[in-house]
């Protein structure tokens, strides 16, 4: 029995308006392919011809012949198995070598079960290793705070209104005004409110950064800082804002200045300019810095320059901060951040598409690292930098664009071989007019789905530890990220029917 997929409109959906014919750019083609791979991971292994049919089924308004489509795919390296043709920038990444500085700043109370040392694979630099055996779901270690706690930029407006914690950004709807006043959780000089005494006590930058002062406090111009913060917020430039907060807190928190700077400088670094040059796509189907509020501007340099000048005005004492150093800080943030925060030890954990650890971030402040499977003493801890549900092409592309390297883990090699085998068998699948995928060869599709189930993490486990995969963040009409994860409701349903 052969099945094919039909896509039908729901009863209560209105008729679709006919769209004018358009000629898509190579960028649009690339973005739609990437979006398709995100929405339907099984299409990751389609041949170029079947991929063309699928994309054209999604965009009947496009004027695009098969040759133009193949050229776009080839130019963007979307179907290339020749690694020599793929751009990577791992050689440009500065990875500080292992030295005694790591041990000196590791909190032995919460991180005594791990150590930092150089990896056997020289390309990976240093890594984090287990000092004892762990069984699945064991807590390996935790970090109570990131290098500095960076307030959630997407909630800055709510913070000013006293509706979200001035430090962690947690919503305050569960706290009564009486409770806030009795426990002195409100600021005497502004509308800021904290969710707990813990957040209030560690928010030592609040007075300097949130209150206007006639003169510089701790070497920081509060008026200029407000302009820098507003510019970053308006342009969804999370990386620049985070770097600014880290630099400011390194000046304000004099007790921990050396520790803050040492932790920051021990993290891997690469210029954001290099990363931009090596990326192929930054629009809705793109993957570049998607987890940290990527800017879709074709020319980000004006935003870099303006934010740099505003930061220099806010912190005039940073004489050593030239434009190239600033861009290296931006790149450092983007390749190390976890949930918009820079945690030290977790940033040292290397990638594998079949990881043995998982993260749990609590209230933007604490991160806990658990064993995903049994781990032996001396074994390297490995995490997944990208969405584990994606197919091998999209996974490797996301790693290449965001982190500068191609993954050669066992899972990737296995899936690449499987895709090549499927393509070599010249599947006779075809795409119907509605964009559905007909499946005349049940055994091949069953084998592909079976191998996908085997290779990917258990879905129940992913749902239990939902920090490890994200809903895509859509863009609004202006092209800027709105930073709010959304669910898209569609007016169509797909079902399988017998031919």
UniProtKB/Swiss-Prot annotation:
Pfam families xrefs: SET
UniProt signal peptide: none
Keyword Methyltransferase: yes
Record-level GO cellular component terms: chromatin; cytoplasm; nucleus
EC number(s) recorded for this UniProt protein: 2.1.1.-
Cellular location(s): Nucleus; Chromosome; Cytoplasm
SUPFAM superfamilies: SET domain (SSF82199)
Swiss-Prot/TrEMBL GO biological process terms: methylation; negative regulation of gene expression, epigenetic; telomere maintenance
Annotated keywords: Chromosome, Cytoplasm, Methyltransferase, Nucleus, S-adenosyl-L-methionine, Transferase
Residues annotated as domain SET: 112-386
Catalytic function, reaction form: L-lysyl-[histone] + S-adenosyl-L-methionine = N(6)-methyl-L-lysyl-[histone] + S-adenosyl-L-homocysteine + H(+)
GO-annotated molecular function: histone H4K20 methyltransferase activity
Family, similarity comment: Belongs to the class V-like SAM-binding methyltransferase superfamily. Histone-lysine methyltransferase family. SET5 subfamily.
Functional summary from the UniProt entry: Histone methyltransferase that monomethylates 'Lys-5', 'Lys-8' and 'Lys-12' of histone H4 (H4K5me1, H4K8me1 and H4K12me1, respectively), thereby controlling gene expression and remodeling chromatin structures.
Name listed for the protein in its UniProt record: Histone-lysine N-methyltransferase SET5
Source organism (scientific name): Vanderwaltozyma polyspora (strain ATCC 22028 / DSM 70294 / BCRC 21397 / CBS 2163 / NBRC 10782 / NRRL Y-8283 / UCD 57-17)
């Amino acid at each position: 029995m052969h099945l094919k997929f039909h896509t039908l409109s729901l009863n209560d959906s209105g008729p679709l308006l006919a769209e004018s014919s358009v000629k898509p750019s190579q960028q649009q083609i690339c973005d739609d392919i990437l979006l398709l791979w995100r929405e339907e991971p099984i299409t990751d292994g389609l041949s170029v011809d079947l991929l063309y049919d699928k994309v054209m089924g999604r965009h009947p308004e496009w004027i695009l012949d098969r040759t133009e489509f193949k050229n776009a795919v080839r130019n963007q390296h979307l179907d290339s198995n020749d690694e020599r043709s793929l751009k990577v920038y791992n050689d440009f990444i500065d990875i500080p070598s292992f030295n005694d500085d790591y041990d000196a700043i590791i909190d032995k109370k919460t991180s005594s079960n791990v150590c930092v040392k150089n990896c056997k694979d020289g390309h990976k630099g240093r890594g984090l290793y287990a000092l004892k055996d762990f069984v699945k779901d064991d807590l390996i270690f935790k970090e109570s705070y990131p290098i500095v706690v960076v307030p959630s930029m997407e909630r800055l407006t709510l913070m000013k209104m006293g509706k979200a914690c001035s430090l962690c950004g947690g919503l305050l709807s569960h706290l009564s005004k009486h409770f806030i006043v009795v426990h002195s959780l409100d600021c005497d000089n502004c509308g800021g409110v904290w969710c707990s005494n813990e957040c209030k006590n560690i928010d030592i930058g609040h007075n300097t950064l949130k209150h206007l002062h006639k003169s510089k406090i701790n070497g920081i111009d509060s008026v200029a800082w407000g302009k820098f913060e507003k510019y970053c917020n308006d342009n969804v430039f999370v990386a620049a804002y985070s770097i600014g907060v880290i630099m400011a807190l390194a000046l304000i928190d004099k007790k921990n200045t050396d520790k803050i700077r040492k932790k920051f400088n021990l993290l891997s670094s690469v210029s954001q300019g290099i990363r931009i040059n090596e990326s192929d796509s930054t629009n809705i189907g793109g993957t570049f810095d998607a987890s940290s509020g990527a800017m879709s501007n074709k020319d980000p340099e004006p935003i870099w320059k303006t934010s740099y000048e505003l930061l220099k005005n806010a912190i005039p004492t940073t004489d050593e901060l030239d434009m190239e150093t600033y861009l290296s800080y931006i790149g450092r943030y983007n390749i190390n951040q976890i949930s918009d925060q820079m945690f030290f030890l977790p940033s040292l954990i290397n990638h594998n598409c079949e990881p043995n650890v998982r993260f749990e971030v609590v209230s933007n402040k604490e991160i806990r690292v658990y064993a995903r499977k049994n781990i032996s003493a001396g074994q390297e801890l490995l995490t997944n930098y990208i969405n584990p549900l994606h197919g091998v092409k999209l996974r490797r592309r996301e790693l290449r664009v965001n982190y500068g390297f191609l993954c050669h883990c066992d899972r990737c090699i296995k899936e690449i071989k499987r895709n090549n085998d499927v393509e070599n068998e010249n599947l006779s699948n075809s795409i119907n007019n509605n964009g559905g995928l007909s499946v005349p060869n049940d055994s091949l599709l069953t084998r592909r789905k079976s191998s996908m189930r085997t290779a990917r993490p258990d879905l129940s486990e992913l749902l239990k530890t939902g920090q490890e995969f994200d809903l895509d963040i859509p863009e609004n009409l202006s092209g800027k990220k709105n930073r709010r994860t959304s669910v898209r409701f569609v007016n169509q349903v797909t079902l399988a029917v017998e031919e």
